[in-house]
């Protein structure tokens, strides 16, 4: 399966509550991609749908040109790090953001500018050198 992720008109409901309604996005292979939003807006729900842990009530999910709506989680060949374990307590904010790039063997001279851009985008550049236990929320 291709590493590109394509989502068209994703819908997820929990009873009468609609958690996602018509979400569409394209994540290109190798793209540095982040889901940002307030608590309860559907970020984790969408990730769980991509990973195959949550059912899909509507829309189409693709890895490359292969539709994966009915592909079981164990056959999707992807991983998911759950929220509580996604941050390394011994690393700074900057190093936590850089971790995924280093793990993918991105050249060192490209990592700092990409991390700086991501921190600036989410307006936390001033927190770059703090450890997780020095942050709130």
Kindly give the residue locations of the regions a language model identified:
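ABC family nucleotide-binding domain
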Residues: 1-137
